Amino acid sequence: MIVNESKNLSWEGEVRIADSFIKRALGLMFKKPRYALVFILPLETRINASIHGFFMLESIDVIFLDSNFRVVDVTTLKPWRIYIPKARARYIIEGPRGLKESIKPEFGDKIKWFT
């Protein structure tokens, strides 16, 4: 479950943590996203938080958070595209299309997840 605490909205889907190099490298490649994947980055930066849609089968919703779990950017990433967030991020949430519509994240909103 992913919760926008600022708006009291939630997405009830499954959440997994990309807690290894391999999981972070593969992300949602070669998969139809049916769950959200949370990336915990070692540093809060823009470049290290950049993402790509190489080998992805569908577009995904992506939410970038700072070290205080506040939204710094939101996008929908199409397959075969590259995206660099507008601000430094420490956490990235990749999920199926519809995630954004469920929790309506905007700059500054506080987001939490539960596995």
Swiss-Prot record:
Where does the secretion signal sit in this chain?
Answer: none
Which InterPro entries does the UniProt record give? DUF192, Saro_0823-like_sf, UPF0127
Q: Which domain of life is it from?
A: Archaea
Q: Hey, which family's this protein in?
A: Belongs to the UPF0127 family.
Record-linked NCBIfam families: PRK03760.1
Q: What is this protein called?
A: UPF0127 protein PH1112
